[in-house]
């Protein structure tokens, strides 16, 4: 029997922000949204990609002849890495191997459920002493539903606490199947207004809110996460719309409150490495005073709220 594989782009250990206790984060590649502030753009496409660090490149051209896909090209003494029109990286990593200056990195790796579970199990002592476990994120983990559900089920069979970070944009049957094996959903609500949500992410939010309602009404543990940007979703009206939507579930034991995730620029450099333009102009980061205002606004409606600073 061939074991299901997942396309992963990172595994992060000793995380303290994305679920209770010390956690291992497994990042699944591929996402149906295109959030303008995305800090993991290398997780958006469900395919191999090349990150090119121009400042490290010595322009030796060693990557060009070893690439079977023609991703690396040279013409008129100009090297181009990973951006060749019509070429797609196949994940062979030969360019990585021959690059003398570590200027190239292939993003994406196929891992079996057994391989992932082995990595997750390495930190069991930390989970047991801290109440931690594993969190699956991305990208969007539910874009690889079979692999995600198989890994979640395997973790539960091994007594490991499970959480997923999700944008909620998935078929409801996928959410229902995953929910059997999830101890906590870290559920993004990027904007409560569907038209505005479309402008910011490329999709409307009706499916997202429908899945959220199903999870809350069926007693699955949910913590709402709001990526917070100044002038985008931090107004009194924006926040009131969010809490009014959540008000029917305010006293549910499975509703675990609201996390605010302030905008940051930690992923900006990766856009250039992918050959992409950064979608946001200006700086929508909130000041400490802005964050205090937003917190106070939510608290006045008697909702538990925390600011998560990465």
Curated annotation (Swiss-Prot):
Residues 48-77, 79-109 form the 4Fe-4S ferredoxin-type domain. [4Fe-4S] cluster 2 binds at residues 57, 60, 63, 99. Pathway: Amine and polyamine metabolism; choline degradation. Residues 17-304 form the Radical SAM core domain. GO terms for molecular function: 4 iron, 4 sulfur cluster binding; glycyl-radical enzyme activating activity; metal ion binding; S-adenosyl-L-methionine binding. It is an enzyme of class 1 (oxidoreductase). [4Fe-4S] cluster 1 binds at residues 31, 35, 38. GO terms for biological process: choline catabolic process. S-adenosyl-L-methionine binds at residues 37-39, 139, 188-190, 264. Binds 2 [4Fe-4S] clusters. One cluster is coordinated with 3 cysteines and an exchangeable S-adenosyl-L-methionine. Its cofactor is [4Fe-4S] cluster. Its EC number is 1.97.1.-. Pfam families: Fer4_12 (PF13353), Fer4_9 (PF13187), Radical_SAM (PF04055). It catalyses: glycyl-[protein] + reduced [flavodoxin] + S-adenosyl-L-methionine = glycin-2-yl radical-[protein] + semiquinone [flavodoxin] + 5'-deoxyadenosine + L-methionine + H(+). Keywords: 4Fe-4S, Iron, Iron-sulfur, Metal-binding, Oxidoreductase, Repeat, S-adenosyl-L-methionine. It comes from the Bacteria. Catalyzes activation of the choline trimethylamine-lyase CutC under anaerobic conditions by generation of an organic free radical on a glycine residue, via a homolytic cleavage of S-adenosyl-L-methionine (SAM). Is involved in the anaerobic choline utilization pathway that allows D.alaskensis to grow on choline as a source of carbon and energy. Belongs to the organic radical-activating enzymes family. NCBIfam families: cutC_activ_rSAM, PFLE_PFLC. Monomer. This is Choline trimethylamine-lyase activating enzyme. It comes from Oleidesulfovibrio alaskensis (strain ATCC BAA-1058 / DSM 17464 / G20) (Desulfovibrio alaskensis).
